[in-house]
Amino acid sequence: MPWPPVFGKVFMSPLQDGFSRRFYYLRLSITDVCNFRCTYCLPDGYRPPAGGKVGRQPFLSLEEIRRVVSGFAAMGTRKVRLTGGEPSLRRDFTAIIETVANTPGIEKVAMTTNGYRLKERAREWFDAGLTALNVSVDSLDPRQFHQITGENKLAEVMDGIEAALAAGFKSVKINAVLLKGLNDHQLDAFLAWIRHKPIELRFIELMQTGEMDTLFRDHHASGALIKQRLLDAGWLQQLRGADDGPAQVFMHPESMGGVGLIMPYSKDFCAGCNRLRVSSLGKLHLCLFGDHGVELRDLLTADGQQDELQQRIRSALVGKAATHRLHEGNAGMTPHLASIGG
């Protein structure tokens, strides 16, 4: 069956790299700005590029977002995740959701958020077409949360999660970056919290980036330790679907919620890669830890550039590597996770 028409054209072939991996999932950063100061991402807060406003590129406009999403949709993309920075800081965020959700071929629109605006906006975003949420909650202890994020807003974030569930979201996931000595002892508290909530808790191993070498050395903890504790407590690892992401998911018969482990240092982590990334300035990134981005923005100025846009994306995909090089201490040119949306 052909893919739906986009800009009057029908495309038959989905995106695929040289290792037979197919890419149905786009992570689209719409801003680098964030109002939190998480130790593992932007410990000093968001700092605009040097030089002030003169010469600084603006983030992708609503029309540029429409064109890039349409281009990916024409090549088989079915899911778009809006990331940042904190995506909800965009004044036109609801319009962005509507634009992406109304793109022919797009079936799921997700966002990753720090959750500080969820309580007031969850219903609005749901009605606009947002279908899934990932909310960052690195600790359930208010003091620890404040220490990790730089903001004393745990209560507001937790209220936002409840508001999202009440608004009708069926897919709510909680992201917690695993930090040795900070939150790696809080597994029992997290499991008790999700026991009666239909959410998936995802522990993410701390990843090495250019500006975080010291933090990585001091606080990296292996997700394998959490995995063993789950198995010992009767949690069952779920079979991974062909189009699932890298998370290893566990369920327990006495828990409504599940647990996902994202362990980029584990064997074969990249084998099932199904996602591509576009930065807030319009660069295509084939890997979170790649060395260079591929410029797309010059092909986002008019609807008539779709053929060229899609060809550039396909050509770039030929060069996608089989795996990252984190085991070699090589994090590419990613200075921090906010720079291309994590």
From Swiss-Prot:
Name of this chain's protein: GTP 3',8-cyclase
Entry's Gene Ontology molecular function annotations: 4 iron, 4 sulfur cluster binding; cyclic pyranopterin monophosphate synthase activity; GTP 3',8'-cyclase activity; GTP binding; metal ion binding; S-adenosyl-L-methionine binding
Family, as annotated: Belongs to the radical SAM superfamily. MoaA family.
Residues reported to bind [4Fe-4S] cluster 1: 34, 38, 41
Co-factor requirement: [4Fe-4S] cluster
Domain Radical SAM core: 18-247
EC class of the enzyme, as a word: lyase
Source lineage: Bacteria, Pseudomonadati, Pseudomonadota, Gammaproteobacteria, Aeromonadales
Gene name for this UniProt entry: moaA
Residues that bind S-adenosyl-L-methionine: 40, 85, 136, 207
Biological process annotations from GO: Mo-molybdopterin cofactor biosynthetic process
Source species: Aeromonas hydrophila subsp. hydrophila (strain ATCC 7966 / DSM 30187 / BCRC 13018 / CCUG 14551 / JCM 1027 / KCTC 2358 / NCIMB 9240 / NCTC 8049)
